[in-house]
């Protein structure tokens, strides 16, 4: 599958089967994530793999949705607070951007392996920080990963046209 096909195939999965994610698939996904670019090669990230039953239950308390509980695996995507490249002109920090780039690499790698994923950003930040304390890091997103359930709801992918989002000058 090429990158366009992966992008077209990937969607936000909100129902997973009971089949666990293989260690081989997980390691592949993590390696693709590791290879993502970042501003000035700072790599200001940490990816916390949540797969034990106890840790999964704790994480589910940080985002209490029924569909979320069906995922066999989660990855908490974190930004290193003091290791962001900062643009001098306007002091814009690029850490969240860098983590987002790596996280989308993660999601596309999961798709390539026949797995589904879903970005979650509307979690209880304070509870997550308390439950999974990583000094010097802050959570940016949680990605649920797993095999897509046969009865997983899907929506038609709606995207703006190229004309709406681009200018060629």
Describe each PLM feature range.
Residues 33, 75, 90-131, 143:
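Small-aliphatic-rich amphipathic alpha-helix that forms the alpha element of a beta-alpha
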């Amino acid at each position: 599958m090429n990158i366009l096909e992966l992008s077209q195939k990937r969607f936000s999965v909100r129902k997973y089967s009971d089949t666990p994610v293989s260690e081989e698939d997980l390691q592949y996904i993590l390696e693709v994530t590791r290879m993502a670019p970042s501003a000035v090669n700072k790599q200001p990230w940490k990816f916390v793999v949540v797969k034990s039953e106890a840790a999964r239950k704790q994480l589910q308390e940080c985002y209490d949705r029924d569909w979320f509980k069906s995922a066999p695996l989660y990855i908490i995507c974190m930004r290193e607070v003091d290791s962001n490249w900062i643009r001098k002109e306007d002091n814009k920090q690029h850490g969240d951007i860098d983590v987002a780039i790596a996280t989308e690499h993660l999601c596309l790698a999961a798709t390539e392996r026949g797995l589904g994923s879903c970005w979650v950003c509307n979690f209880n930040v304070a509870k997550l920080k308390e439950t999974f304390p990583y000094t010097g890091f802050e959570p940016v997103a949680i990605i649920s990963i797993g095999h897509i359930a046969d009865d997983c709801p899907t929506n038609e992918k709606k995207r703006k046209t190229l004309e709406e989002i681009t200018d060629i000058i």
